[in-house]
Every structure is written in C-alpha cells, then in structure tokens.
C-alpha cells in the first residue's frame, strides 16, 4: 500500500530490455525514500516487486495470473498485457506532446510492459465488466475486498486513505 519507501520509479531506461533478475537488481540497489511504514508515497516499484512476488508464489507472471483469475471469470474478452508488436484491431494508442504537437508515444521495452504496474489493454466492454464486478464483487473474494478497503496505517498510527490499489472515501 505504498509505505515501503521504495522510489517512484526504478530509474532504469524504459527502452532497454532487462531480465527479471536485472530489473529486480536495479530496484534492490535503490536507496529508500523513507523508512518502511513511516510515510505513504505512490511507487511503481511497489507494483514491480508485487509482480515478482506473484511469480515467485504462483509460478505465473502477473498478466497470466490476472488473466486466469480475473479476466476470464469476468468474460473480459480483450483484456491482455500490452504488446506493442501485436496487431490489435481498433486499438487506441497513446500520445505524447512534443514541441507542442501530439505524437505517437515512444515505444518502451517489453520488460516495462510485463510487470504488475499496469501495462494492460482493456476495451470499454472489459472496463464495463470490471465495473459491474466491483459492484457485485464476485471475482474477488470477500476477504480480499476487506483487505483492499483497509486504509494504510503508518508506524506513527496515522491513517492514510489508501488500501491495496484503491483510494478510500
């Protein structure tokens, strides 16, 4: 819940391919921004580490894990990890503003698209399926929703209104 102290990004080059061990090694060598549990600060590194934990515990990469446990049970037909090389009909691509003009977003490495910090394609219908499940709460166990809905408690006792991936309130 972003109380680890890990920096926001791993400071790597997102256009360079890394092995899992190389990327984890980059994160391992980073200095913490603060002592774990003392503050809250959003960090993509937390999600990258989460992806490695999912792989270590389940033997599955994040995208495979969420496909089997979330996308398929909810009937999300197009949800998939980002693959810049795949031909996806009607795909909406990202844009950057450079020199005041919109341009196609620059390619980033497949490594950056394989971690648990996002990097998914979903259609509007898939988002609707996800939203409907949020209301009905069928695909995610009740105890998981209970954990998700708990705000972060810092070592000082202060509460920060963010659960596991969700702002509270």
Predicted feature locations:
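Short, surface-exposed loop or secondary-structure junction motifs
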Residues: 1-169
């Amino acid at each position: 819940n972003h109380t680890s102290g890990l920096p926001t990004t791993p400071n790597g080059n997102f256009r360079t391919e890394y092995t899992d061990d190389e990327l984890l090694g980059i994160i391992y060598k980073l200095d913490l921004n603060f002592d774990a549990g003392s503050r809250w600060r959003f960090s993509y590194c937390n999600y990258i580490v989460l992806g490695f934990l999912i792989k270590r515990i389940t033997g599955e990469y994040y995208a495979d894990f969420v496909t089997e446990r979330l996308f398929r049970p909810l009937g999300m037909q197009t949800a998939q990890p980002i693959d810049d090389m795949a031909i996806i009909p009607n795909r909406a691509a990202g844009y950057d503003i450079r020199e005041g003009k919109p341009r196609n977003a620059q390619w980033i490495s497949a490594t950056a698209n394989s971690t648990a910090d996002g990097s998914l394609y979903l259609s509007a219908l898939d988002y609707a399926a996800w939203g409907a499940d949020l209301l009905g709460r069928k695909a995610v166990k009740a105890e998981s929703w209970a954990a998700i809905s708990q705000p972060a408690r810092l070592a000082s006792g202060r509460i920060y209104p963010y659960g596991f991936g969700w702002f509270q309130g």
